[in-house]
């Protein structure tokens, strides 16, 4: 019950492209980003510090780094454009900044899919921040 409440609170704050990111993760990895990656390891979810704990957590680290390189738009609440053709998703639109945000999200969704076998909910779901105190590697 507590987990459901936490997820409901997280969803209340989701606007703009974060819902698009959730959709991309569902389409590509076949998993809910909120449920699977909303609080996983040291980098999946809000914030991020320390060393990525496994390849799935590294997907979130790389995603955070990707967002850090985007300038000129809000990475969390502006909508971007993408298209689907024959199962392939392509980021587009007139705004180069939002296209970059889409490409960050798309790369993360593909990374999650490619690392489903490394996902370890028993070990890294709701991972305590006190275990993420090692020095972070550079992006």
Curated annotation (Swiss-Prot):
Q: In which tissues is it expressed?
A: Expressed by the venom gland.
Recorded catalytic reaction(s): these are: a 1,2-diacyl-sn-glycero-3-phosphocholine + H2O = a 1-acyl-sn-glycero-3-phosphocholine + a fatty acid + H(+)
GO MF, any single term: phospholipase A2 activity
Indicate the secretion signal residues: 1-16
TM helices/strands, residue ranges: none
The SS bond pairs are: 42-132, 44-60, 59-111, 65-139, 66-104, 73-97, 91-102
Q: Which UniProt keywords apply?
A: Calcium, Disulfide bond, Hemostasis impairing toxin, Hydrolase, Lipid degradation, Lipid metabolism, Metal-binding, Platelet aggregation inhibiting toxin, Secreted, Signal, Toxin
| Class of the enzyme per the UniProt entry, highest EC level | hydrolase
Keyword Hydrolase found? yes
| Keyword Calcium on entry | yes
Family annotation (Gene3D superfamilies): Phospholipase A2 domain
Which SUPFAM superfamilies does the protein's record reference? Answer: Phospholipase A2, PLA2
What domain of life does the UniProt record list for this protein's source?
Eukaryota
Report the protein name in the record. Acidic phospholipase A2 DE-I
